[in-house]
A protein has these predicted regions:
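Short, amphipathic alpha-helical "recognition" segments used to contact nucleic acids or chromatin
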Residues: 113-126
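Short, conserved DNA-binding cores of transcription-related domains
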Residues: 1-106
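Conserved beta-strand -> loop -> alpha-helix junction used to position metal-binding or nucleic-acid-contacting
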Residues: 240-247, 252-288
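RNase H-like nuclease fold core
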Residues: 86, 90-95, 103-107, 142, ...
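Acidic/histidine-rich catalytic cores and adjacent linkers
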Residues: 3, 258, 291-412
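DNA-recognition alpha helix
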Residues: 130-141
Length: 412
C-alpha cells in the first residue's frame, strides 16, 4: 500500500516533533512517556492560567486592566492520573476562592474522568455499548472498546452494592412492592430473572427506592428474603404495604412485619378480571366493576359486588369469586379518607418507576450477567430519582390522617 501523502501542516508538525525529540535527548520509550507527561502538564497549566485570566478579567501582571477586588493567590499542586502515569499540575488559585476551573474540575483526578462520567450517563440512559463507542468517537475522536466500557461501568458496582446495604429509616408510611422481569444468560442458558423492587414513602412524604434485588422468578419465598433484608437495614414498621396478588405475598409480609396492613393493587385485579372477557362485554363489565372499587365505602362496594355477581355470574363466574376471595386485602383502602385512598389503592407509584426502567433497558433483550443487569438498573435509578425532590401530593393532610389511624405507632 503506498504511503499517504502528508499535508504541509502535518510535515511542519512532524519537523517540530523531530526537533523536540532531538533536543530532549530521548533514548527510550520511558523518556517518551516522561515527555508526554510534561506535555500534558504544560497543556493543563496553560489552559488553567487562561481560564483564571478570563475569570478575573485581566492577565498576569496586567494591573492597568484590573477591575476587580479579586486577585491571583499562587498555586496548589494536584496529582492527575493519566495513561502515561501520574502528572503533577500546578493549579492557579484566586484570593477569594471563587475560581471554578472547567478544564480540570476541583474533584477531577484523571484526564479520562470526564469521558468516564459521559459513558456512565449514556449507559444509564440505556445506550448500548456499540452506541456509546460511536458517540464517544464522534464527539471526542477517541476509540473505546466494549471491554473499556464494561471496565468503566463495573466501577459503579461497589457503589451500587453499598447503596443496596445502606441503613434505612425506622418507619415508612407506605411501601410499594413489585417485580419486573428480564432475561439473563446463566451457565450457557438464557433464563428469566425477576428484579424485586421496594419503593417507600417516609413520614415526610418523600419517595425513595429502598432496594432492587435480582433473583429467581418471582416468588413469595424470595419476597420474604427481601423483607427480612429491609428489617436488617433498620426498618421496624411499615404502616401499609401495596402489592400485587402473588400467592403467599400476604403471609410473607405478615411473617416479617405483622402489624402492616396490606392493600392489593386494584389495577392488577382489574387486569386479571378482564383477561378472558369477550370484546363485546368488556366495556359494560368494567363499568360494573368500577361501581365496586369506586364505591363511597365498603358496604356500598359489597352491594355493588353482589349486583355484579347477579348480572355476570353465569357468564364469568371466576371474576366475582376472585374479588370475594381477595376482598380482605382489596378493600383495605375503604377505611381511609380519599387522600390516603388515592395513594394506596393502586401501585401506580412503583409502576411508573418500573416503566422508566423498562424504557432504559428496552434495547437489551438479554443481559450477560446478573451484575450487568443490576448496574444498568442502578444507574437508571440514580438518573430517574434525581427528579424526586418534592413531597407527595396532599401530604400534610395524609400525615394528619395517618397520625389518627396509626396513633400508637407514629413516632413522636
Amino acid at each position: 500500500m503506498p504511503r499517504r501523502k502528508r499535508s504541509p501542516e502535518e510535515n511542519e508538525r512532524r519537523a517540530k516533533i523531530r526537533e523536540l525529540l532531538l533536543s530532549s535527548n530521548i533514548s527510550s520509550m520511558e523518556d517518551i512517556q516522561d515527555l508526554f507527561k510534561e506535555t500534558i502538564a504544560e497543556f493543563m497549566e496553560s489552559g488553567l492560567e487562561a481560564e483564571l485570566d478570563d475569570e478575573l478579567g485581566y492577565g498576569r501582571y496586567d494591573y492597568r486592566n484590573k477591575d476587580t477586588d479579586n486577585s491571583r493567590n499562587g498555586h496548589s499542586s494536584k496529582t492527575l492520573r493519566t495513561s502515561y502515569g501520574d502528572v503533577e499540575v500546578a493549579v492557579p488559585r484566586d484570593r477569594k476562592g471563587e475560581f471554578e476551573p472547567q478544564l480540570l474540575k476541583k474533584n477531577q483526578t484523571s484526564v479520562s474522568q470526564d469521558i468516564e462520567e459521559k459513558i456512565l450517563s449514556m449507559y444509564a440512559k440505556g445506550m448500548t455499548t456499540g452506541d456509546i463507542e460511536t458517540h464517544i468517537q464522534d464527539i471526542y475522536g477517541i476509540e473505546v472498546s466494549d471491554t473499556t466500557i464494561s471496565r468503566i461501568t463495573d466501577k459503579i458496582l461497589p457503589i451500587a452494592k453499598e447503596w443496596q446495604q445502606r441503613p434505612l429509616e425506622a418507619v415508612y408510611a407506605v411501601v410499594f412492592l413489585d417485580a419486573i422481569h428480564y432475561h439473563v444468560r446463566s451457565e450457557g442458558q438464557i433464563v428469566k430473572k425477576a428484579v424485586y423492587i421496594a419503593l417507600g414513602i417516609n413520614l415526610d412524604g418523600k419517595k425513595d427506592v429502598l432496594g432492587m434485588w435480582v433473583g429467581e422468578n418471582e416468588s413469595a419465598k424470595y419476597w420474604t428474603t427481601v423483607l427480612n433484608g429491609l428489617k436488617n437495614r433498620g426498618v421496624e414498621d411499615i404502616f401499609i404495604a401495596c402489592t400485587d396478588n402473588l400467592t403467599g405475598f400476604s403471609a410473607a409480609i405478615g411473617a416479617v412485619f405483622p402489624k402492616t396492613e396490606i392493600q392489593n393493587c386494584i389495577i392488577h385485579q382489574l387486569r386479571n378480571s378482564s383477561k378472558y372477557v369477550s370484546y363485546k362485554d368488556i366495556k359494560e363489565l368494567m363499568a360494573d366493576l368500577r361501581s365496586v372499587y369506586a364505591a363511597v365505602d365498603e358496604p356500598a362496594a359489597l352491594d355493588a359486588l353482589d349486583a355484579f355477581s347477579t348480572k355476570w355470574e353465569t357468564k364469568y363466574p371466576k371474576i366475582s369469586r376472585s374479588w370475594r376471595e381477595n376482598w380482605a386485602n382489596l378493600s383495605t383502602y375503604f377505611k381511609y379518607p380519599q387522600e390516603v385512598r388515592r395513594l394506596i389503592y393502586t401501585t401506580n407509584s412503583i409502576e411508573g418507576f418500573n416503566r422508566q426502567l423498562r424504557k432504559v433497558t428496552k434495547t437489551r433483550s438479554v443481559f450477560p450477567t446478573d451484575d450487568s443487569l443490576f448496574k444498568m438498573l442502578y444507574l437508571a435509578m440514580v438518573d430517574i430519582t434525581k427528579k424526586w425532590t418534592g413531597r407527595q401530593r396532599d401530604w400534610s393532610m395524609i400525615h394528619a390522617q395517618l397520625s389518627i389511624y396509626f396513633a400508637d405507632r407514629m413516632p413522636e
